[in-house]
UniProtKB/Swiss-Prot annotation:
This is Uncharacterized protein BB_0228. InterPro entries: Metalloenz_LuxS/M16 (IPR011249), Pept_M16_N (IPR011765), Peptidase_M16_C (IPR007863), Peptidase_M16C_assoc (IPR013578), PreP_C (IPR055130). The lineage of its organism: Bacteria, Pseudomonadati, Spirochaetota, Spirochaetia, Spirochaetales. Transmembrane segments: none annotated. One of its GO terms (biological process) is protein processing. Pfam families: M16C_assoc (PF08367), Peptidase_M16 (PF00675), Peptidase_M16_C (PF05193), PreP_C (PF22516). GO terms for molecular function: metal ion binding; metalloendopeptidase activity.
Amino acid sequence: MKKKKIFKLISKTYLEEHDAEGYYFKHESGLEVFHLKSDSFKENAFCIAFKTIPSNNTGVAHVLEHTIFCGSSKYKIKDPFLYLLKGSLNTFLNAMTFPDKTIYPAASTIEKDYFNLFNIYADSIFNPLLKKESFMQEGYNINPKDFKVSGIVFNEMKGSYSNKNSLINEIVSSSLFEEGAYKYDSGGIPTNIIDLTYESFLDFYKKYYTLENCKIFLCGNTQTEKNLNFIEKYIIRPYKKEKSNVNINIENVKRWEKGKKLTYKIPKENDNSLGVYTINWLCTEINNIEDSIGLEILSEILLDDSCSFTINILKSGIGEDIAHISGINTDLKESIFSFGLQNVVENKEKEFKNLVFSELKNLVKNKIPKELIKGILFGYEFALKEEKGQNFPIALMIKSFKGWLNGLHPIKTLQTSYYINEITNKLEKGIYYFENLIEKYLIFNNHYTLISFIPSHDTEKEMEEEIEKKLMAREIEIKQNPEEFLQFKKDYNQFKKYQNKKDSKADIAKLPLLKIEDLPKQIEKSLDLNEIKELNLHSFKFKSNNIFNVNLFFKLDFLEKEDYIYLSLFKRALQDLSTKNYSYININNKIQNTLGQINISESYDEDIDGNILNSFNISFKSFNNKVKESFELIKEILININFHDYERLKEITLSLKNDFKSLLIPKGHLLAMLRSKSKLKLNEYLKELQNGITGREFWQKAKTDTESLKEIANKLDNLKNKIILKNNLSALIMGNTDDILKNLENEFFNLKESLEESNHYNGLLNLDANSKALREIIIIQSKVAFNAICFPSYKINDENYPKANFLEHVLRSGIFWEKIRVMGGAYGASASIANGIFSFASYRDPNFTKTYQAFEKSLEELANNKMTDDEIYTYLIGLIGTNIYVKTKATEALQSYRRKMLNISDSLRQDIRNAYFTITPQDIKEISTKILTQIRQHNSIASLVNNQIYEEEKNNLEKLIGKEYSLKKIY
């Protein structure tokens, strides 16, 4: 009897830009599968996706995305996702809620691990337990004693709504849709999240998590048939639901005949905070792929610093800087283009709108400079031809779902090169393609909103008051019915018991894990680099698509304290100012038309003996036919940069100020860690000067009048004279032929010879040896806290380092997750050991002192209780997995170079890997005791919290750390 085909092949399509075949299948259940297959792909990935349409702001899709991984019919443990974090070799593991879809992607370089991940994801998504206790944990819960509310999603979104830019993004999207999915925040608004009922939550799952609403994207080198058989066995056969015929298409909105003017309040960071103006257009459907890609390119053109549109609007003085919202949003069925200014003059929204339209009309009239268009398109061409690194399949999947979930073939939105060629052909025929887009989607498009965002101290207060009002009403209502109140208390008590309950060994044992023999025991060895000592140059030959890479390293040995603060502006200015021979517009066009990519950064490094090896790094890459041109351009920038271009310097300085100002909420945990580490090591102190709260405060106070700009320019000149020096410079060059490497070597030699010698003395700073450990509480305007504690620990060459590194993984992916995230309600918690410092931190945390207690209690538990052999093995898998990821050859070469500079040998790395395999439960018990001693002997604490949390927990804080701490406010 002939075997019936389970899946019908709809099409087979070759995707040229990725040298891959795309197989598109449909199952009779309605489930669709697309497999993008190529033997060149280094990791295998899958993504299970559903269209999920919100009808309110309760964040039900978001809460469901979190709760999906709280146990399933086959894997009844409380958090299978946590076991994947600590016990798989994954290269990607996540779940994401978008405005109109929810996706569940994962990836691994090991085929067996890939199918293990797929197995757990499949059962979690299609057969979840969805217990009420999980709903309360991940969504929100109300304590019957005081009717205070908490929950992971609730706290996450409180943090999000404390962030000005996040709030603006959400308001802009909803402003263009008077009805339908995009009117609502799929993540949830805190005031509405507490309205979500458990029954509505279950109904949402039943409606949207069906086979006919499911799309599965596969990417990698595994066999297509093997994947389809897996899906049939683990998804389709166990599926119990009846087929649903619910229509979940998103209707296009009716276009307006006239734009709308709106006003909203946003959080006021300080008394001097200024507002934001934005104008936002609803553009085109995603199925108009050419224009969608065209609008993406147009967005880059309009927002380019050399475009007259941006230049003239900034010159107007209406606002200080381009708003973060500016650009194209293609995550929706219909795209949105926004342009905005931040720190604006009050009551100038009409002038702002008129100026935007006037400058757009001028661009159409005078035409966009061809060199600008050519440069932007060159960047796209280069990106398509460059070797792809880690998580490249995930980016492809997200891009595919934009069209696939809205009725297009899954490969359509991946065919970027085809549509760019179509656009290029039109340009070559003399068609003013981008000017036509400006007219069609911006100038003559009446479906737009002009929004004034006014800073107010009332926004968060009003949100808290609304939450309190709802909770009070809920309390009165529940307490009026004794039976209902009794059930309410029972539910909460059951929830707390659930959180404290341990998973059974029998349930844990059901999880599919890799065997010990599946784990790579040998490290990936460093690459052999060729060295030319007299030039301080290393080189590496590798297969590339006729692309070369150059990494320049300038030592930072001659800097003083203030110099480090100016580094942030210095690295921006090098890319964004005029030079002796070129205006800013001309040098910008040359960069875009010559370099495929340029990146300027700094590294704060120590070698294995603790010697500081900090460097200022300039990396660039391009096609082989642009070697000489690229080096000439870099030479022009390094030697002839004009820091005294005051008009442009002012714009860059204001942009830096605004970027620093917006760091607090999205990067609060990193700022707390930087601050905490700064009293423990000189290098951490220097890093904090540049990138931390010290740097932020300095630039917030910086003035931009003419005299101040002259002083800044002189500082930058001085900094250049200390860094861009012949005897400071070393390099790593990479290319695909001996001839190219020789060309690169010659050009590097010429560059080096054109630089001046140093006449400075080593200026490394000293950290005050008598400085006390930091105890600092920083008051910020946020409804959530960011806590960090750091302390001296083991360096990489210490015999205890492998055990401490293993403990880091146990804390980060195990006990901190349980105590701080699951039970504490924080959005995240971390542990890391690097350069002899152990760091613990929490992110978007509703707690303050409780988190510090949780850090220490976690260590106490591990010191007082032995882990099992099975637990050790699970963590071993995950720890090995943190060292396995997809790297390009260029990345491998750069890593090898850095290891050589830091004296980290392959033999040391192999010794550490070997040690991981010998670690026992007793070792973890002992190392936990040692780390506990370390944290108690000498630690440094920094917390970013709001004033209310601080006042409420002040007494607890002083019991924990005493009264000797500093208190400061920042905005």
